[in-house]
A protein has these predicted regions:
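Active-/binding-site microenvironments in catalytic and ligand-binding cores
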Residues: 1-175
Length: 175
């Protein structure tokens, strides 16, 4: 138990707590601080299957946009719990590739990552290699009114020297 707690503390000290993104081997471009945004309500996707392109309106995706996925998971499952890290929703690899093919700059989820377990880091690296960052644990997307269609995402990372994760603040505003 102590070894597991030590591992969790090490992860937190490297910037992987709360809303953050994994730096991978890239640098966050300042041009990503303000982006047009689209939110996808995926609360109706059953927990026993991946979120796929069929679950969203892909025509809303634009090159250089912020794509947020609101599953409601972070509001139902306690942050930091075993279930939060092991049972969260996942985006299918086909959907991840579609987002990257569309040129999405930021992919935000209200859960612990695009993929679970051993697939988490490779999925983040896949995005980073294509110029996209993944914002994890973005709480509160469900508060954005469903009828708001023109959104801007303001994303402000907090630089931590030597960290592999950057805590960030994200504000979604309507145009």
């Amino acid at each position: 138990m102590m070894a597991e707690a030590g591992k969790e503390q090490e992860i937190v000290l490297k910037g992987h707590m709360g809303t953050h993104f994994d730096v991978m081997d890239k640098e966050f471009p300042l041009s990503y601080c303000v982006l047009p945004a689209v939110l996808f309500d995926v609360t109706s996707v059953p927990a026993d299957r991946e979120i796929t392109a069929e679950d969203i309106d892909t025509s809303l995706l634009r090159k250089g946009c912020f794509a947020g996925f609101c599953s409601g998971f972070s509001e139902r499952v306690p942050y930091g719990s075993r279930a939060y890290h092991k049972e969260h929703p996942q985006l299918s690899y086909d959907l991840i590739d579609l987002l990257l093919d569309c040129g999405v700059s930021l992919i935000a989820v209200d859960f612990a990552g695009l993929r679970r377990g051993k697939e988490h880091t490779p999925a983040d690296q896949r995005c980073a290699d294509r110029g996209a960052f993944v914002i994890e644990n973005l709480y509160g997307m469900s508060r954005v009114p469903k009828d708001v269609t023109a959104l801007t995402a303001y994303t402000f990372p907090i630089r931590l020297i030597g960290s592999s994760g950057l805590p960030c603040r994200v504000v979604l505003g309507s145009d």
